[in-house]
Swiss-Prot record:
Organism: Cryptococcus neoformans var. grubii serotype A (strain H99 / ATCC 208821 / CBS 10515 / FGSC 9487)
UniProt keywords, alphabetically: Acyltransferase, Amino-acid biosynthesis, Cytoplasm, Methionine biosynthesis, Transferase
Subcellular location: Cytoplasm
Gene3D superfamilies for the chain: alpha/beta hydrolase (3.40.50.1820)
Recorded metabolic or biological pathway in which this protein acts: Amino-acid biosynthesis; L-methionine biosynthesis via de novo pathway; O-acetyl-L-homoserine from L-homoserine: step 1/1
Extent of the signal sequence: none
Low complexity bias locations: 389-409
Location of region: Disordered: 250-335, 388-413
NCBIfam families: homoserO_Ac_trn (TIGR01392)
Residues that span the membrane, as ranges: none
Sequence similarity: Belongs to the AB hydrolase superfamily. MetX family.
Gene giving rise to this polypeptide: MET2
Family annotation (InterPro entries): AB_hydrolase_1, AB_hydrolase_fold, HAT_MetX-like
EC number(s) stated in the UniProt entry for this protein: 2.3.1.31
Source organism phylogeny: Eukaryota, Fungi, Dikarya, Basidiomycota, Agaricomycotina
Protein name from the UniProt record: Homoserine O-acetyltransferase
């Protein structure tokens, strides 16, 4: 047994994000990143289903996307179960959390053993190759001799492509990348930059040191973060995950209100708009406000940090300024500007109309800040930017195909393309799946993968949901993945490793049974 053998974590991390998941966490004594930085006592979160067969070669590795976790049941639940693509009675299923994610593996919210405080912005950058090498250590400790197939979409698809190149030759038998690319495009890099700038522009970001509260003597509070910036970044990301047609069909120009906290029981039927929400202004409240006040409120609708209205250009103080911050806090609440009529101009008394699409984005942004960390978001989007399958691994401790890829700092575009073609030629048999309406990882990028991998099949799934189709088109994806595995690996379908009668079956069918915590799938995308 080597000195670097993972050991179970004895004292669970107090990280509130990791506590959202029932999973296992192992500690790796030492791990060196592609950058050359060595990390000590590295926590790695993972989850498994099923069990290994006698040959220990029936492992299915599932790789999560940017904001996902090791809990496959949460974001790909309809694909996991008896007689489904990810069948625990036939396969030993493993999913590891990536470096930089707040859900258990080492990240910005992990306590730095040298300082006793979270790594924060001082967490060293990582690559997709690092994730593969880290998870390989865990797989070997679990007794896995070889992997039947690696499956994943988006960032998870990048991990899938790197697996055969960053583990010993022959360790991975087949791969199934979905909605991904061989190298991160300029389009995706630009969207990632825009999202990071949203976080940086939040005054609460504090260069990433927002965990420490100065007025409380440097006390660490992981719940403290630049929530407005992170919410804005999430909103921008959601627009890249869906398609124009998807938003138009679901929302159109319909009014929307969103979830709000209001007392149960009672309805106002006189003195103002009929409502069950006590925060909605009455007729007298609205009448007391000046036209300039109403214009100010409409202009700042959705601005989460709007305080008291400043003094006007004329030097006078509007009614809002005199009434103080409490009154202003009221007018910027989402529930205060629910569908209260059709007046949008500043001259009317009705609050500004909020479109359903706006309300959806605001709700999703707020929801995201409760389950993800801003520094972690920055870390992982930068990880995505570094993705290039043709880049050789700097690690020489493990004999892998990636470490043998040609490298030249002054390579021309033609040489870079040749390196990519060479890297793809080293991949094992593959089922490449794309989403027809995906504007983030286009079908042309899926064609590039399939054309470069020697034994590859390409499937394009029609879906109006854009990139998120890989998380929503469960039935189609299940059918193609299971069918391909049966053709390529019939031996795993000749006998089971777990008696079906002993397996606790979850929900049947391919519909979304519950709202996902870590994925994009919603039981009803218009419910919020």
């Amino acid at each position: 047994m080597s000195d670097n053998t993972p050991t179970p974590q004895k004292n669970p991390d107090t990280n509130p994000y990791a506590s959202l998941i029932s999973q296992q966490i192992a500690i790796i004594p030492s791990f060196t990143l592609e950058s050359g930085v060595t990390l000590n006592n590295v926590p790695v979160a993972y989850k498994t289903w099923g069990k290994l067969n006698e040959k220990a070669d029936n492992c299915l590795v599932i790789c999560h996307a940017l904001t996902g976790s090791a809990d496959v049941e949460d974001w790909w639940g309809p694909l996991l179960g008896l007689n489904k693509a990810f069948d625990p009675t036939r396969f030993f299923i493993f999913c590891g959390n990536v470096i930089g994610s707040p859900y258990g593996t080492i990240s910005s919210v992990t306590t730095n053993p040298e300082t006793g405080k979270p790594f924060g912005p001082e967490m060293p950058g990582s690559s997709v190759k690092d994730d593969v090498r880290l998870h390989y250590i865990i797989l070997k400790s679990l007794g896995v001799r070889s992997v039947a197939a690696v499956v994943g979409g988006s960032m998870g698809g990048m991990t899938v492509l790197e697996y055969p190149l960053n583990t010993p030759p022959g360790f991975v038998r087949a791969i199934i990348p979905l909605a991904t690319s061989a190298r991160h495009s300029a389009w995706c890099i630009s969207w990632g930059e825009a999202q990071r700038q949203s976080i940086y522009s939040d005054p609460d970001y504090k260069d990433g040191y927002y965990y420490e509260i100065e007025e409380e003597g440097g006390k660490v509070d992981l719940a403290r973060q630049p929530a407005r910036g992170l919410a804005a970044a999430r909103m921008a990301a959601l627009l890249t995950y869906r398609s124009r047609d998807s938003f138009e069909s679901r929302f159109g120009r319909r009014a929307g209100g969103g979830k709000s906290s209001v007392p149960k029981g009672g309805v106002r039927i006189m003195g103002g708009q009929e409502t069950t929400d006590p925060s909605v202004p009455s007729e007298s409240d609205l009448a007391a406000k000046s036209p300039s006040w109403r214009a100010w409120r409409e202009h700042n609708d959705g601005h989460r940090s709007a305080g008291a209205r400043p003094i006007s250009r004329s030097g006078s103080e509007g009614p809002a300024h005199r009434e103080g911050d409490a009154a202003q806090a009221e007018v910027v609440k989402t529930q205060d500007v629910k569908a209260n009529g059709n007046k949008i101009g500043t001259g009317g008394e009705a609050p500004p109309k909020i479109f359903s699409a706006q309300s959806y984005l605001r709700y999703q942004g707020d929801k995201f800040t409760g389950r993800f960390d801003a520094n972690c978001y920055i870390h992982i989007t930068r990880k995505l930017d570094t993705h290039d399958l043709s880049a050789p691994s700097r690690d020489t401790s493990l004999s892998s195909l990636s470490s043998g890829l040609p490298s030249s700092p002054d390579a021309t575009e033609e040489e870079l393309n040749a390196r990519l073609i060479h890297a793809l030629s080293l991949e094992p048999p593959a089922l490449v799946i794309g989403i027809e309406s995906d504007g983030l990882f286009t079908t042309s990028e899926q064609r590039e993968l399939a054309a470069g991998i020697p034994d590859a099949e390409l499937v394009v799934i029609p879906s109006p949901d854009g990139h998120d189709g890989f998380l929503l088109e469960f039935e189609a994806i299940n059918g193609w993945v299971e069918g391909w595995l049966k053709r390529k690996m019939p031996e795993f379908y000749e006998r089971r490793v777990i008696n079906p009668e002993e397996y606790v079956q979850g929900e049947e069918g391919f519909g979304i049974k519950k709202e996902s915590v870590f994925g994009e799938a919603e039981a009803d995308v218009t419910r919020w």
